[in-house]
Amino acid sequence: METNYLGLLATILVILVPSIFLVILYVQTSSKSES
C-alpha cells in the first residue's frame, strides 16, 4: 500500500508541476501581450 501511495503521489506531482508551470507561463505571456 505504501508503494501505491508513493506512486500515486509521484504521479500527481508529475502532472501538477508541469501544469502549474504552463499556467504561469501562459499568464505571463497573456499579461505581456495585453500591455
Swiss-Prot record:
The keyword Transcription regulation does not apply. It is found in: Cellular thylakoid membrane. GO terms for biological process: photosynthesis, light reaction. Keywords: Membrane, Photosynthesis, Photosystem II, Reaction center, Thylakoid, Transmembrane, Transmembrane helix. It is a single-pass membrane protein. It holds the Pfam family PsbM. The chain crosses the membrane at residues 7-27. SUPFAM superfamilies: Photosystem II reaction center protein M, PsbM (SSF161033). GO terms for cellular component: photosystem II; plasma membrane-derived thylakoid membrane. InterPro entries: PSII_PsbM, PSII_PsbM_sf. One of the components of the core complex of photosystem II (PSII). PSII is a light-driven water:plastoquinone oxidoreductase that uses light energy to abstract electrons from H(2)O, generating O(2) and a proton gradient subsequently used for ATP formation. It consists of a core antenna complex that captures photons, and an electron transfer chain that converts photonic excitation into a charge separation. This subunit is found at the monomer-monomer interface. PSII is composed of 1 copy each of membrane proteins PsbA, PsbB, PsbC, PsbD, PsbE, PsbF, PsbH, PsbI, PsbJ, PsbK, PsbL, PsbM, PsbT, PsbX, PsbY, PsbZ, Psb30/Ycf12, peripheral proteins PsbO, CyanoQ (PsbQ), PsbU, PsbV and a large number of cofactors. It forms dimeric complexes. HAMAP family: PSII_PsbM (MF_00438). Belongs to the PsbM family. This is Photosystem II reaction center protein M. The lineage of its organism: Bacteria, Bacillati, Cyanobacteriota, Cyanophyceae, Synechococcales. The gene is psbM.
